[in-house]
Design a protein with these regions (language model features):
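Short, glycine/polar-rich helix-capping loops at beta-to-alpha or helix-loop-helix junctions
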Residues: 32-33, 101-103, 139, 159-165
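Nucleotide-sugar donor-binding patch of glycosyltransferase catalytic domains
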Residues: 115, 145-194
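Hydrophobic/aromatic beta-strand patches that form the interior of the parallel beta-sheet core
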Residues: 18-20, 44-46, 93, 111-113, ...
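Active-site-proximal region of nucleotide-activated glycan assembly enzymes
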Residues: 1-45
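Donor-nucleotide binding loops and adjacent catalytic segments primarily
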Residues: 35, 47-130, 140
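C-terminal amphipathic helix plus adjacent low-complexity
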Residues: 185-221
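A donor-sugar binding/catalytic signature common to diverse glycosyltransferases
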Residues: 120-163
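Short acidic active-site motifs
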Residues: 8, 119-120, 139, 183-186, ...
Length: 221
């Protein structure tokens, strides 16, 4: 069935001038999701994308946890994190991603922010020793851009997240656990065995003017 669906998708893709793949071909963050055995014709890797940028930061937190994703797993994840993080003697931050409110709550050494804008989240991530988050691809690209050590907790039932978490765990980049098994002592200990994300590897240089020349040529025509 998967092969049939792939053939149908590739036939539809073939009608376009190019197929852009959001990954770095040499680094291959997404594993077989961006590098299957067979690629569509006229495919082009355009590198990874992130809203964040590297900045100088002072370490403020031992751990920053980021909640995201659909309900009901979002709330389950949030409650589990609060339960374990509020018991820690270390300074920690929990970002809930709830855009409908801007509230701050403190429980012992845990600060809970209902919402952080992109700039504040960028700063928070870089001021922490370790990140806990879901393993969605956009999150992974952000963590890679900022060269962070992370523990990935895939949303149960989301096969893409489960694959990416396992793939990066096998590559010894990120430790990964199920949300029911979150244990801070174990997380801190196990995360030391993983390298974290690094931008030090040679990346494919993307010429954006060449990519967007497709649209310029179409406009001229």
């Amino acid at each position: 069935l998967q092969t049939i669906i792939q053939k149908i998708n590739y036939k539809l893709i073939s009608k376009f001038k190019e197929c852009w793949i959001i990954d770095d071909e040499s680094i291959n963050l997404a594993g077989s999701l961006s590098k299957p055995k067979y690629l569509p014709q006229k495919s082009k890797y355009i590198g990874t994308l992130s809203r964040f940028k590297k900045i100088k930061s002072v370490k403020k937190y031992k751990l920053v946890a980021i909640v995201s994703g659909p309900e009901p797993q979002r709330t389950i994840f949030e409650k589990k994190l609060i339960k374990v993080m509020q018991k820690s003697n270390e300074k920690m931050l929990l970002a809930l991603g709830k855009t409908e409110s801007y509230e701050t709550k403190k429980i012992n050494n845990l600060t809970i922010k209902s919402f952080l804008n992109s700039n504040d989240l960028n700063i928070a991530i870089q001021s922490s020793d370790l990140i806990i988050s879901r393993s969605g691809y956009s999150t992974i690209m952000d963590l890679h851009k900022l060269e962070k050590k992370a523990v990935l907790v895939p949303t149960p039932g989301q096969t893409e997240q489960e694959y990416l978490a396992n793939y990066l765990k096998e590559k010894k980049i990120c430790y990964s656990i199920h949300q029911n098994d979150i244990d801070l002592d174990k997380i801190f200990k196990k995360s030391e065995e993983y390298s974290g994300f690094s931008n030090s590897k040679k990346r494919d240089k993307i010429k954006w003017e060449d990519l967007f020349s497709l649209f310029q040529n179409k406009r001229k025509g």
